[in-house]
Design a protein with these regions (language model features):
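Active-site-adjacent structural elements in enzyme catalytic cores
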Residues: 1-207
Length: 207
């Protein structure tokens, strides 16, 4: 039976987030709120947790996941960022964007796109997500909480608990959350390519 923490959306309780971080380090799968939707989170070095999320979401092995980072310094560790891309990242983070970047050798190959050797990275603009990343002290692998046969992510934390309490280790209740996906911008080449229009404004990058 998974645990259920009610975390204050403005002043998150540090003791609860410390326990959440301990679960992640121990190989747990947690559900946490972001600025776009609720998401699964797990330690980037844990293969078993990765497989659990694949099964929960009903997705194939070639599905790309996202690395949730606290700030730009984390991004620079796991992705190669050109100067022009860095300026864009600085302007758009934190926020509802996922950026596709070329991965560095610090990132395990199983987490990279097998063909392009890239990774999707985001910096969530959400108090609880930021606090969790701060306590954890490293990025968190992340995937939208979209279940098989569902058209939209789950948004109500009590509904999430009722449906997943036997399948995840923790649900962090940060209140009702949105269901809009992030906008995805590919920065792995020489210019910005919009891969998905979502919550973040992409009008500046469309011709």
């Amino acid at each position: 039976m998974g645990q259920y923490f009610k975390v204050h959306p403005v002043n998150p309780q540090l003791r609860l987030l410390n326990r959440a971080a301990e679960m992640v380090r121990a190989g747990g799968v947690v559900v946490y709120p972001t600025d776009s939707s609720y998401a699964f989170g797990w330690h980037m070095g844990d293969k078993a947790a990765l497989e659990r999320v694949r099964q929960l979401r009903g997705i194939e092995r070639d599905h790309d996941f996202t690395l949730a980072c606290r700030d730009l310094s984390d991004i620079a560790t796991y992705a190669r960022v050109e100067n022009w891309a860095y300026r864009l990242l600085k302007a758009l983070t934190p926020g509802p964007y996922t950026f596709v970047l070329r991965a560095t050798h610090q990132l395990p190959k199983r987490l990279q796109d097998p063909k392009r050797r890239s990774i999707g990275i985001r910096v969530p603009d959400h108090t609880i997500a930021q606090a969790l990343l701060g306590v954890l002290g490293e990025p968190l692998m992340s995937s939208t909480l979209l279940l098989p046969r569902e058209q939209f992510p789950l948004t109500d934390p009590e509904d999430i608990r009722d449906r997943l309490e036997r399948q995840v280790d923790l649900v962090i209740d940060g209140g009702s959350c949105g269901m809009d996906p992030t906008s995805v911008l590919d920065l792995s080449g020489d210019e910005v390519v919009v891969l998905r229009k979502g919550k973040g404004d992409v009008s500046a990058f469309e011709s």
